[in-house]
UniProtKB/Swiss-Prot annotation:
Pfam families: MS_channel_1st, MS_channel_2nd, MS_channel_3rd. The chain crosses the membrane at residues 20-40, 65-85, 89-109, 137-157, 177-197. It comes from Methanocaldococcus jannaschii (strain ATCC 43067 / DSM 2661 / JAL-1 / JCM 10045 / NBRC 100440) (Methanococcus jannaschii). InterPro entries: LSM_dom_sf, MS_channel_1st, MS_channel_C, MscS_beta-dom_sf, MscS_channel_2nd, MscS_channel_C_sf, MscS_channel_CS, MscS_channel_TM-2. One of its GO terms (cellular component) is plasma membrane. Belongs to the MscS (TC 1.A.23) family. It is a multi-pass membrane protein. Keywords: Cell membrane, Ion channel, Ion transport, Membrane, Transmembrane, Transmembrane helix, Transport. This is Large-conductance mechanosensitive channel MscMJLR. PANTHER family: MECHANOSENSITIVE ION CHANNEL PROTEIN 1, MITOCHONDRIAL-RELATED, YNAI-RELATED MECHANOSENSITIVE ION CHANNEL. Large-conductance mechanosensitive channel that opens in response to stretch forces in the membrane lipid bilayer. Selective for cations. Rectifies with voltage. GO terms for biological process: monoatomic ion transmembrane transport. The keyword Signal does not apply.
């Protein structure tokens, strides 16, 4: 075998000129795709500023990425066709490129419909009902739309790969009973999720207590509900089980109650007890995470080894990182009380006992 023949075998019977044309085609279309993406984004911005028509803007923005990828895929398609490939390899490459084109279309509909739901569903219903749409309804609708789009996309891809969709659907019909039995839990969880959304025993951001624990509801999904527990862990509860629970719900828990007792020594004079109450109240009033009202600080009782000052206050809650905010606020308040008491010479009490020893002479 001559050197020329060896090189020809290595290059799969393509000339260097063929490879250069293929590479130029791919690079050229990558550059065009990049600029097309930027151009479409600028067009969307300009359209929004001029007309303020959000639907057109959504459509164009949703097109930007899929169009850019489609242009780049076109470059690969033309690049491959500049080369001589084995028929089976060429067919496989072309099928792969066509599959990627279908994915671009799926991504477009996924982006466009989800943005449409995000922007217009809440606005449309709120105009009719004069109230905001619950966040979880929008989230659930987006998930369902995404599921439908990707299922249709998967069927198109399978059809492109040579599978008979009618046969597949018929097979699903024959095995429908088995699928129904296997998906019984999924269906029951889906129905339970819809019951939670419509009946509204709780909403995202509510604090609930049930047999499995307690915490803030972070997400109500198709299959399960996610609850942020007090130790910052996530409890995932199937919806079908949750609706059978006895749930204690504080729907307006926008604050956390803190009740604590601070003991000072028995030799603390009355003036310093009053000063201690004043210090604690000022610290709570000045902290940004503490509700201004109600704050309760009072001399509660004469304890076994301390004069007890009762402190009750409320920490503002937030939908996200609520528990972290709760513990960090308590930490900051307690450190500040310790610092101020030390500075004013107010002593904390600790368990002490006085022993009287009687000596028999």
């Amino acid at each position: 075998m001559t050197i020329t023949q060896m090189i020809s075998e290595i290059l799969m019977h393509n000339t260097v000129y063929n490879y250069i044309l293929s590479l130029i085609s791919i690079i050229l279309f990558i550059v065009i795709g990049k600029y097309a993406n930027a151009l479409i984004e600028r067009l969307a911005d300009k359209l929004h500023k001029k007309s303020g028509i959000e639907l057109d803007e959504l459509l164009i923005r949703a097109l930007s990425l899929p169009v850019a990828i489609a242009i780049i895929l076109s470059g690969f398609y033309f690049g491959v066709n500049f080369l001589y490939l084995l028929p089976s390899l060429k067919t496989a490459v072309n099928e792969g490129i066509l599959t990627a084109f279908i994915l671009c279309v799926v991504v477009f509909f996924d982006r466009f419909l989800n943005e449409l739901v995000e922007r217009y569903l809440a606005l449309t219903i709120s105009k009719k009902t004069k109230k905001d749409v619950d966040d979880q309804i929008v989230v659930l609708t987006k998930k369902l739309v995404r599921l439908v789009v990707w299922v249709v996309g998967l069927l198109l891809i399978l059809s492109n790969l040579g599978y008979d969709i009618k046969t597949l659907l018929a097979g699903l019909g024959i095995g429908g009973l088995a699928v129904a039995l296997a998906s019984q839990n999924l269906v029951s969880n889906l129905i339970a999720g819809l019951i939670i959304l419509t009946d509204k025993p709780f909403k995202i951001g509510n604090w609930i207590t049930f047999s499995g624990g307690s915490g803030i509801v972070e997400d109500i999904g198709i299959r399960s509900t996610k609850i942020r527990a007090t130790d910052n862990s996530i409890i995932v509860v199937p919806n079908s089980k949750l609706i059978d629970e006895i749930i204690q719900n504080v729907p307006s828990k926008n604050k956390w109650k803190v009740s604590t007792t601070i003991g000072v020594t028995y030799n603390t004079p009355v003036e310093k007890i009053r000063k201690a109450e004043e210090i604690i109240k000022n610290i709570l009033l000045e902290h940004p995470n503490v509700e201004d009202e109600p704050i309760t600080v009072y001399f509660k009782e004469f304890g076994d080894w301390s004069l007890n000052i009762q402190v009750v206050y409320y920490i503002k809650n937030s939908r996200y990182n609520g528990y972290q905010k709760y513990i960090s606020t308590i930490n900051e308040v307690n450190l500040k009380i310790k610092e101020e008491f030390d500075r004013k010479g107010i002593e904390f009490a600790f368990p002490t006992y006085t022993l009287y020893l009687k000596r028999d002479d």
